[in-house]
Structure formats: structure tokens, C-alpha cells
From Swiss-Prot:
Zn(2+) binds at H566, H570, C668, H672. This is Alanine--tRNA ligase. Its main location: cytoplasm. GO terms for cellular component: cytosol. GO terms for biological process: alanyl-tRNA aminoacylation. Belongs to the class-II aminoacyl-tRNA synthetase family. GO terms for molecular function: alanine-tRNA ligase activity; aminoacyl-tRNA deacylase activity; ATP binding; tRNA binding; zinc ion binding. It comes from Frankia casuarinae (strain DSM 45818 / CECT 9043 / HFP020203 / CcI3). The lineage of its organism: Bacteria, Bacillati, Actinomycetota, Actinomycetes, Frankiales. Its cofactor is Zn(2+). The gene is alaS. It catalyses: tRNA(Ala) + L-alanine + ATP = L-alanyl-tRNA(Ala) + AMP + diphosphate.
Amino acid sequence: MDTAEIRSRFLNHFARRGHTVVPSASLVAQDPTLLLVNAGMVPFKPYFLGDLPAPWPRAASVQKCVRTVDIENVGHTARHASFFQMCGNFSFGDYFKAEAIPFAFELLTEGFGFKADDLWATVYLDDDEAEGIWRKLLPAERIQRRGKEDNFWSMGVPGPCGPCSEIYFDRGCAYGREGGPIADEERYLEVWNLVFMQYERGEGAGYDYPIERELPARNIDTGMGLERMATILQGVDNLYEIDISRPVLDAAGRLTGRRYGADPADDVRLRVIADHTRTAAMLISDGVVPSNEGRGYVLRRMLRRAIRNARLLGAHEPVMSELFAVVGSAMGTIYPELLDNAETITGVAVAEEQAFAETLRTGTTIFDTAARQARSLGSTTLGGEAAFKLHDTYGFPIDLTLEMAAEAGLSVDEAGFRRLMDRQRQAAKADRAARRIGNVDLSAFRPILARSGPTTFTGYEELSRTSGVVGLVGIADGAGLAAAGEDTEVGVVLDATPFYAESGGQEPDLGRLRFDGGEVEVLDVQRPVPDLVLHRVRVLGGELRLGVEVFAEVDADRRRAVSRSHTATHLVHTAFRRALGEGATQAGSLNSPGRLRFDFHALGAVPPSVLADVEDEINEVALRDLPVRAFVTTQEEARRLGAMALFGEKYGDAVRVVDVGDYARELCGGTHVASSAQLGAVKLLSEASISAGTRRVEGLVGLDAFRYLAREHLLVSQLSTALKARPDELVDRVTDIVGRLRDAERELERLRAAAVLAGAGALAEGAEEVAGVAVVTAEVPAGTAPDDVRLLALDVRGRLAGRPAVVAVAKADGSSIVVVTDDAARGRGLRAGDLVRQSWASLGGKGGGKPDVAQGGGGNPQLVPAVFARLRGLVAEHASR
């Protein structure tokens, strides 16, 4: 069974059971805590957490996923892959264990043809409910209980959690010892995990956390690895050899002159090439491009590992273009974007291969030299300096150096490497502002400093002033200029400026510089070197010359909006420390007009109630109209006064302290409002994790907060009018409507089923006698639910008890058919699965099944009469033998 068919059967199985089929989301995660989607449930996370109402009660999907935490195992084991597809069915407060377990079991046994005797199940230690359901499907000896580590699931943070049940396939005694999954997970292969979200967990590390309560709405989240299922159903040894992976594996062998299966060491490298090429193609198709950070670095690492392994196997020419073409051919049916955007996708990979070729050649030479030197000194460790040089000079990622060192029998002084990297980061921090505005040559600023001295910042006291132009530099190359004409961008240094340069998370001031005969727009303000302020400007008119006087004027409205955000951030910082403890210190911030972003240290999510309390406290402080005061003092005195200093920041002997009344006191060089009342209002919008131990809250300040609240009020007002309810009644009213709608849908389904089954007696009475077999063929309306088609066929068969019977019920549009037979008919060779294959499938549809019940799909209205005629012919043929 090819992978596309497995995928189709999975989705069709759940579509017939009322699930909405949801297309795969992009690999680029919308979740701020993730770089890439790494599990099938990630796109549904907001619904499970209750952040958003689920658009459907039931859903099914095949989600693209990338997981790189164990990338070193890729190629070495039969199971590890960096890209995989996760089949999942989900329920959002609709069905639970009693339905989820049979749904999975039916697909495995009826849809995929697993023998029930080969299946095992595990349940959580005290999950009697799940075991009771499984006992109706499997004997007790093939159901095992396991502890929290194996059979209890949570997201790793406070929120939904619950027991899970895993389904295993017994591959046979050739793969290991008997005893079930507890004894040997090499022999007993996990094929499906069913998670029952029924509890809410509290804070705690690892598996040590309390269960706070049972959830009011219980959810289902399941995961069945498509590649793993294909490995089993296609009878191959590992997931690299299935139909969508093997072509890439063979292409890698052909391009490197190595035959897969001839040498175990070569096989590992070929599998790495095949795996990483597929992953890279999928990432690029979702818009990821190679870079040195984030998901771009994941892609770059994949491509470079694949390229290096190809070179090690003997490929002297570029290989990415052909490998990506093979990936497109193998997977383009499922993911047409691989074919539609083939030129762009391949172009990204080829460009990276070309860029890395010289890096790999030179870097490998440097590595080999360093390795020889280490051995000549009797060392088994590659120095941190050598690893840093490879990274800094030749673009070798440290993980590649570690991999090469391990292959050479060496370790790497990682601590030394990290020290040198930290030193470089500190140096880079000093010139990051200059690089942002385009200048990378800091030497251009030294003569300006020597000639004119430091820039005097006057922006705390004034928003405009007359200043002299003491420096002009080109943005592209940093070269000194004498003049700049209209519509050009240049860097301007003034002897004194009211413009605040970006620093401490506060965005820079913008505005204008006016001079005799012209004007420039200030686009950005940075400190490329200490004591010097550089204004990136665009000349709007006239010619700006070195030495002229300009009238520098800050955009006052923007400055006030940014200052409101900065003062609000101080209040947010203090409020979180008061609510969560002294450890909730600032990890970063961004203060822009009307909006703030505040990162802080915390072990887990902030409960919504605490977030609401923090917001209330901030607005209460704002209403107190506390004076905001800034003063300069010594570090020692600031510490004595209890001023908060930000971790990782460096301060001089003289520091600036900002007070907000008696509520907040911090070391800060930013601009602020004069009193807390000038904030207007603060609205916190979101809180989420951005990394382990670090949370991020975002909010609106001032007019932006008021506008947001006004929109929310309007929305509530419109909902109140539409639902004829007061605002405080809306939740109950919506809950009631949703409940009644669900009840109505169920009643409608019941009535539809009753209407269909009402004709069962007449159909049985009208059975046609064919060679001693009662044959019933019936069409039902196209809108009939799949389950009702099946129920009607079974009901008619039951009414024909005592006679050999074959019953076929098809939907009028040809989208599905169900054929059932009884024991007597099967005794005469009439098996339902064979009848479907020899009638429905032979005439253009698809289908099959068990001897007693089988079904088909993918037909058309014209197919139905022909199939019924063919069925009667098959009955006559078999029964008369």
C-alpha cells in the first residue's frame, strides 16, 4: 500500500466519522514558543488551551513536522527522521475514549488490514476506563499498564494533560523477545498514540506536577506516524526505504557512486543525505531560507550536512539540483507546491551548495591541520581556538566541527569555544547599531570623534535645537562625505542632538533636520560607537553640507507615545515582580509608539487571573498620577536606594535612575512621561513562552489601548444585540446556543438514520433470489451519512436471517458503497471484500474490506447500476459452483 493510499484511507476513515479534514499547516510555527511545527497537534494548540474556540467539534489532519533534537541519530536507526508526517484525529469536547479507541482499532484492522492478534495496547496505570474499552477489542493479556513517563501526556507547562493509550504492532519473534511493549519495543512497534486530555496540571518539573482538576470539556489528540505506518505496510526495514523516500536514497547512491546496502557505513551517509534533502525541500517550500539563526539555521544545517556527506561518499559535482527534483517527483502528488515552486525551491538549495563548497574545502583543510597538531602534542582534544577559527573565519557551524572531531576520534574544547564566542558577541554588541544602519566600517567615526568630540544629547530637556553638522558618512560604505544631494541617504553626526538613539529596548526618535535651502527626514538614530550619535537621513530638498547649521526637530507625538510605552514597561516589570516574586526580572523589552513588549524570567505560564491582577495594578498606579523623576547618582547609591538593574547590562560609575513615585525605581537611560497619569491606560494582550524559563507579554499603551478597548466594547455590544443578552450573560448564552446546536445536530443525525432504516423491511421483502442466495441492492440519497449506509446494509442482512444473503447499499452519487454477507453466503464463497474488489473496484472505484463487511469509494452515479448488475453476476457465478 503506497503512502498516498495510507494517507487517503486515514483521512477518509475519519471523514466518514464526522471529522472535518484540515489541511496541513505550514512548517513555520505560529506558536511563538516553537521555531517549527514538531507535532501533529501544534496547529490545534490554541483550541486545546482554550485560547480560541475550535471551529469544528472533530478534525483530522496529516501534518508536516520537523524535529531536529536527535538529528545525530538520523541515518543510524530505522526510526529517526528529521521530517515526518503525523496523521491525527482530534476531538474538541465532542467524543472521548469510548469512541477514540474503536476508531483507531477499526482503521488498523479494517482499513489497513492488521490482524487483531498482532496488536497490543498500553494504558496508563490507573486508567480503568481505557482498559475496559480495550478489553472489548483485545484479550486482557495483550493490554499492559505503564507509568507516567510512558503513558501520561502534558505540554510541559501548566494546562491540559491526561493519560494516553498506545497501540503496538508485534513484528514477530525474529525482532526480539516475547512479553509485549514493556519487554521489547524493538519487536513491538508503536503505531498510534491516543491522548485523552481530561485534566489540568499545575506547576512542576519533569513528571513531578500536581493534577489540579478535571477539565469541563475533554479532548482527544492522537498521532499516527505516516512514514512508520508505511514502513510496516510496505514490508521494508526502515522508513528510508518506503515509496516516498527510497527514490531519494537511490538518487543519492547514484550521484555518489555508492550502492545502498553494500556497506553499512556508506548506508548511514546515504540515509542522512536522503533525510536531510527531503526536510530541506519541505522547509524551503514553506518559505524558510538559509541563515545563521532560528529556523533558517535549521535549514542551513540540514543542507550542509547533506552536502558534506555527499562529498565524503565521493560526489565531486553539485548534487542538490537532482536530489531536489527527485524529492519533488516522489512527494509532489501529496504536496504539489514542491512541483509548482520547483525552480525557486531548487534555486535556494543550489545557491547554498555553491556557497558551502568553498567553505567545506577550506574548512576541512584547516580542521585536518588542527587535528594533526592536536595528535602531535599527544592530545585527544581539538582546542577551542581552532573550533572558533573554523566558525568565525570559515563559516563552519560548531555542530559540524563536533561531528568531524568525533569521526576523527577527538573531542572539542567546547567551553573554550563558548568563551571566545561570548567575547565576540560583546564586541559585536558595540557595533550592532552601526551595522543596522548600513555602516560596517567603524574607522570612519574615529576622525569625527577626534575632531569634534562626543555628541551631546539634549533630548531629556528639549525636542528641538540648532546644531552643527560635524560629520557626513555614506550609508553603503562608511566613507566620509563633504555633501549630500537631494534624494540620497547618508549618516549625519551633529555636535549636539535632541534625538534619542535606539537603546535599552526603546525605539529611536524620528523627525526632521532643516537648514538654509533644504530639509532632511530622520529615518533612524543609532550609536555606532560610544559617545557618538548617528542619524540616518534622507535628503528631501537642497544640498546638506558638512559644517552647516541645522534645526533639529524631534517628532513630538512619536516621542510622547514611545515614552508612554517605556514608563509603562517599568510598571509592568515591578508589577510582575510583586506578583510572581523577585525572580521575575526583565530579560528584554521593546518600547515602540503605543505598544510594549516585555520579556521576563519565569518557570511557567502566568495564570490568566494573575495577568489580570497585574494589569489592574498597573492601571491603578497610572490613575494615582505619580510623578516620574529621573536623576543621576552613583551605582552604589542607586543600589542603596533599591533601584533595579537589568541583568547583562553594563553600567558606569554614574547611573541614571528613574522613579515612578514610590512604586518603581530602575536604572534607565530612556525617555519617560512626567507623571503616571499620562499613560492613559495599559492593556496587556498576550503572554507566552519564548524560550525555556523566559516569558513574553505584549501590550498597548495610551490611545492605542483606548482604541483597542473601544473595539472590544463595540464587539461585545454587537454580540449582545445579536444574541439579545446583557454582556455578563454572553458566555452562558453562547454556551447554551452551542449546546443546543450540538443537540439539534445529533437529533438530525438520529432522524436521518431512522429515515434510512425505515426502508429496511421493504428492501428485505423485495430480495431477489439468485442461485439460492437472497440478493438486495439499494440506492440511498447522496446526503446519507456513511455510518447510516453501513447500518442499513447490516439491518437488511439481519432481516434475511436463515437465508444465504448478500446486501449492497450505495449512495446515489457513487461516492460510497457497502457490501455485507452472512455466514451462509460466505460458506458458498461469497466474501464481501472480494465482491467489492471484483465489482466496484474493477469498474473504476476503490475499495475492499473483510469477508463480512466491505466498502468502496471514489465512484460516480453511472457506476452504481453497473456495479449492482456485476454483483448479481458474481453471486450467480460463485453460488452455482
